[in-house]
Amino acid sequence: MANVSMFAQSLHYTTQFLPAVCRAHDDVLLRYNLYISGAGAQLPRRVTRTVQIDADGFVRFVFDVKVFHLERLTVVERATAGDLDDYVEVTRPELSAHDAAIFKLVCRDRWCKGDAQRLRRILQQPRVDNLIKFACNVIWERGYEDHYTIGQQLSILITTKLIQSGLDFKHQPDTAAPASVRGWQDETFEKYLLSLSSVNEIIKRHVFSKKYICLEVAAAHWRSVVQALQDEGFKLAFNAHTPHVLLICVDDDKNSMVYMLKLAHLLQTRVVNLLFATDVEFYMRANHFTFYVYNSLKFYYYCLKNKFAFESNDKMLMFLLYTIVSLEWFNKGHLNSFTLEKSELYNPLELATRRLNSIKRAAQQNRVVECDSEIGVDYVRGKRVRTGTHYGQRAVQFE
């Protein structure tokens, strides 16, 4: 007999050889054995029956019984996935093969998550039709999303994050302290890392005022390298969580390339290893595409994953980051391929609503608008611009 504290109690019964007429009463024999065992004849049970017949025609019954005690399912460790499947088959015989498979999947999902409370409530539900429909929709949606192109997935990630951040700002402002602390002994750099905690925030990234170089130093040379850098007057910051890693704070009037030229010998002999530099804009201006892309990927990956090296299971994230970085390169520092409203230059991809809003503001002030340099109204040709109802004084002059 199995441990009585388990959700499924396994029992084995073997009767003596009985007259053949007893084959019609095997269920009575089973219930009698359950009763004398104290297992409870009224509980849901899964029974495997084997009938043995001897040479004289007498029969013997072998029962392998699994009795289910739902009240014992207080923690998921008291059940196995197979026990849940058997319980569903015993208690839900009316379900079709498809619905039963989906319902088993839902139960296994709660079991794998360790959510015994919801699992027990699901198993006790008298009707599960709506739950099965919901699970089918979830599986379909997930399968549909898996076939999105990378661009579509990037768009979904961005818009979902924007919508959620708007809801959080409006309804549920987050006042909790940030949970991600990287251990750097530089408060400014820590704040910079925390400001880039999602793909969407990387897209909206602004040029940071401070510049840093992150280096990994060989353990055997750690003390001597740190001492040499300090003797050179470099401003260093160390990490309390990761040994043999340090930050060099770059002077405002310099760039990371100047520092790396000084460290060229150490880099070539692999005494130090460059993890990333934060002044990626310099390499865009210097037209170093390869280093710009690789360095940007390393830095953003560290911001999102807190890892200095790429991992193969993050291929999707790396591809999204590569898409963002490449777009910034080809658009000369901007992810968007259009400029802001106050700029003198416009791109055809500029939103028409911004131009219309500019016209409305100009109408309120009765000012003259330079079409070519300010509005580019050719791109909104054919649209009716509403600048006011029955108010003749409100006019815009285009030149």
Curated annotation (Swiss-Prot):
GO cellular component terms listed in the entry, alphabetical order: host cell nucleus
Query: What keywords appear on the UniProt entry?
Result: Host nucleus, Transcription, Transcription regulation
Q: Where in the cell is it found?
A: Host nucleus
Gene Ontology biological process = regulation of viral transcription
> Where is this chain primarily localised?
host cell
Q: InterPro entries recorded for this chain?
A: Baculo_p47
UniProt keyword 4Fe-4S present = no
Which purpose does this protein serve, as stated in its record?
Answer: It is involved in regulating viral transcription at late times postinfection.
Protein family per UniProt: Belongs to the baculoviridae p47 family.
Q: What is this protein called?
A: Viral transcription regulator p47
Q: Supply the source organism's classification.
A: Viruses, Viruses incertae sedis, Naldaviricetes, Lefavirales, Baculoviridae
Q: Which gene encodes it?
A: P47
